[in-house]
């Protein structure tokens, strides 16, 4: 079972053939398409005509100010968001650094939530546009750290809320403070330890209650270390990258995360080996996801909190990252969602409040319109839509 999947850097030479890999040993990191690819994963290629390249139009120069925005919304049953928009409250600052002659792309998150037909809002999210100071990384190796996450709770609000409040705090405590031999390996190990520790903390608290809490939650987290994204995922929430292809002059939706459900072969094998079973596509006929935070009663049946971790090098052609829970993807394909957002970003009729940059108003509107449209299309789940703007 691969724990890590890499997105290759844009100009990395092609990987060896499958036969050669088989001879040389197992592949540790699964590659995703390079810059020029239009492959959108399982959804197939996504091509958008007549759209400007990333960084064109009103995207402008993004910056990362020292302030940070944390949005934690209670969420407990893998559903989505309230009716108010939640937005990153500071300007994005583009950090120019004489580091490998590169520019650190600014990142800024925007989010909207709708409760939908659910009685309770069980989704949660966190936006931390810049936590470099809190992480205190070795300045010779790392210039900027950002964190964005969505959590889709089930069985209650407590697991998703706990993860939103504690996972990034555990990550900050475990983040490398001194010089390291390999930033990539150290960050991946940090993420694995963080997920394990957060799950253990919640299960300890849940089991001490009378009756014991049975809540669980998915988790999709994007950790940006300079221009490298590390995507850690449990369950069926997703992260999608919108990347512009210069050759085709079209945009593509690239999947950054892997969904975990009990019908997948390796997931089912792990569950069965642990003594569990899969009925009607669910663990023991009940739980829809095969990896999660919480769900203590299913952990002995093969459900795990070990995330898949993928690595992606940002490029000048990247426009934004979409993070959303399955309430969105029940009624939108990744391609449709990205296309919808792009159309909103090109809408010059969107009005802005005095003092707010037009680009912020457009991203806020894109989140809110997409969440509203998901509800209109009949998503009965909570809906959380987070879009992370990539500044150039």
Swiss-Prot record:
Residue numbers of N6-acetyllysine PTMs: 210
Catalytic activity, as annotated: O-phospho-L-seryl-[protein] + H2O = L-seryl-[protein] + phosphate; O-phospho-L-threonyl-[protein] + H2O = L-threonyl-[protein] + phosphate
GO MF annotation list: metal ion binding; protein serine/threonine phosphatase activity
Inducing factors: Activated in response to stress, such as the addition of ethanol to the culture medium or UV irradiation of cells. Inhibited rather than stimulated, by Magnesium.
N-acetylmethionine: residues carrying this PTM: 1
Highest rank taxon of the organism: Eukaryota
SUPFAM superfamilies: PP2C-like (SSF81606)
Residue stretches making up the PPM-type phosphatase domain: 108-390
Biased composition range(s): Polar residues: 59-70
EC numbers on record: 3.1.3.16
Binding annotation for Mn(2+) 1: 152-153
Pfam families: PP2C (PF00481)
Low complexity bias (residue ranges): 31-40
EC category: hydrolase
Cofactor note text: Binds 2 magnesium or manganese ions per subunit.
Extent of Basic and acidic residues compositional bias: 72-91
Keyword tRNA processing appears in the UniProt entry: no
Keyword terms, alphabetized: Acetylation, Cytoplasm, Hydrolase, Magnesium, Manganese, Metal-binding, Protein phosphatase
Gene Ontology BP term (one): regulation of nuclear cell cycle DNA replication
Positions of region (Disordered): 1-91
Cellular component GO terms held in the UniProt record: cytoplasm
Entry's family note: Belongs to the PP2C family.
Quaternary structure annotation from Swiss-Prot or TrEMBL: Interacts with ILK.
Protein function: Protein phosphatase that may play a role in regulation of cell cycle progression via dephosphorylation of its substrates whose appropriate phosphorylation states might be crucial for cell proliferation. Selectively associates with integrin linked kinase (ILK), to modulate cell adhesion and growth factor signaling. Inhibits the ILK-GSK3B signaling axis and may play an important role in inhibiting oncogenic transformation.
Name the record gives this protein: Integrin-linked kinase-associated serine/threonine phosphatase 2C
Species annotation: Rattus norvegicus
Species lineage: Eukaryota, Metazoa, Chordata, Craniata, Vertebrata
């Amino acid at each position: 079972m691969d724990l890590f999947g890499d997105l290759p850097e844009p100009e990395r030479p092609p990987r060896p053939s499958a036969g050669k890999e088989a001879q040389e040993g197992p592949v540790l990191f699964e590659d995703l398409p390079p810059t020029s690819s239009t492959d959108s994963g399982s959804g197939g290629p996504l091509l958008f005509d007549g759209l400007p390249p990333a960084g064109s139009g009103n995207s402008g120069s993004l910056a990362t100010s020292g302030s940070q925005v944390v949005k934690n919304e209670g969420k407990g049953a893998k559903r989505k968001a309230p009716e108010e928009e939640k937005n990153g409250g500071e300007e994005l600052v583009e950090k120019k650094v004489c580091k490998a002659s590169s520019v650190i792309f600014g990142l800024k998150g925007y989010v909207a939530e709708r409760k939908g037909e659910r009685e309770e809002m069980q989704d949660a999210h966190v936006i931390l546009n810049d936590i470099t100071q809190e992480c205190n990384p070795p300045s010779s190796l790392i210039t900027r750290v950002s964190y964005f996450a969505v959590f889709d709770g089930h069985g209650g609000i407590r697991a998703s809320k706990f993860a939103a409040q504690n996972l990034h705090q555990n990550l900050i405590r475990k983040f490398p403070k001194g010089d390291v031999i390999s930033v990539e390996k150290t960050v991946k190990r940090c993420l694995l330890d963080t997920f394990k520790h957060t799950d253990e903390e919640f299960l300890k608290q849940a089991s001490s209650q009378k009756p014991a809490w049975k809540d669980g939650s998915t988790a999709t987290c994007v950790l940006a270390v300079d221009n490298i994204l590390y995507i850690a995922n449990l369950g069926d929430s997703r992260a999608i990258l919108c990347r512009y292809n210069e050759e085709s002059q079209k945009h593509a939706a690239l999947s950054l995360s892997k969904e975990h459900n009990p019908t997948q072969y390796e997931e089912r094998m792990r569950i069965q080996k642990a003594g569990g079973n899969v009925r009607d596509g669910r663990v023991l006929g009940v739980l829809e996801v095969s990896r999660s935070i919480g769900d203590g009663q299913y952990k002995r049946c093969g459900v795990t909190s070990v995330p898949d971790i993928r690595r992606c090098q940002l490029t000048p052609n990247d426009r934004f990252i979409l993070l959303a829970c399955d309430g969105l993807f029940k009624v939108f394909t990744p391609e449709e969602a990205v296309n919808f957002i792009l159309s909103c970003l090109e809408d010059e009729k969107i009005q802005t409040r005095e003092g707010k940059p037009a680009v912020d108003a457009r991203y806020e509107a894109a989140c809110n319109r997409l969440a509203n449209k998901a509800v209109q299309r009949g998503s009965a789940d909570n809906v959380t839509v987070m879009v992370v703007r990539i500044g150039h």
